[in-house]
Amino acid sequence: LTEFFWPLLYYIKQQILLGNGIPLWNTMFFSGTPLLPDPQNLFIYPLNIIFLILPIDAGILTSILLHLIIAFFGMYQLLRANDTSKKVGIIIAILYSLSPKLFSYIEAGHLGLIQSWAFIPWVYWATINLCRKKNLKSILLLSLFLYLVYSSHILIFAILVVTNFLLFLTFKKNAIVMFLISHIILLLFSLPILIP
């Protein structure tokens, strides 16, 4: 966290605040590295706007807390969508949002993994919601949650796409069309990252 993410956050924030816009090249490592196509790019994740508002240290703590809350509500929503009782939903959501795996990410300073972990249950909830309702709102929600995972950690995103596809296969055949539409919209969201 202090050797990779903190300096990058500081550099990006300073460049934006100085009026230089979003930096596309990181001059801090070696002879420089591109920032935009970096899979752990910090400024494409929408919730990282918090770092422009708060000091970086406070922003990191706030971001972690915010993602713990998002993880809790995501797991609770997923369980309630599957007819789990409120009490069991709350208990499992607490266990998920305070899981040792997530806290190992926090201790290691893996900001992208922390952020993506929060949206895993939301992706599955949106998938189930899309297979049941098959409407534009459900397609857009799934695309949004997949984009949030994509913009925070690419490996978790890849795993989610595969498992999401397998989940779609358990529903009716026309659900595959919804899967494809949601992923085309996701691709459109991701074009600014993929084009350079």
PLM region spans:
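Membrane-interface coil-to-helix junctions
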Residues: 1-72, 94-117
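Membrane-embedded helix bundles of polyisoprenyl
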Residues: 70-81, 86-171, 179-196
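Short, charged/polar low-complexity linear motifs in solvent-exposed/disordered segments
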Residues: 42-44, 123, 175
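Short intrinsically disordered, low-complexity coil segments enriched in acidic
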Residues: 1-7, 173-183
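Residue-level recognition of short, well-ordered coil/turn positions
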Residues: 20-21, 134-135, 174
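Transmembrane helix interruption/hinge and helix-loop junction motifs
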Residues: 53-59, 152-156, 172-174
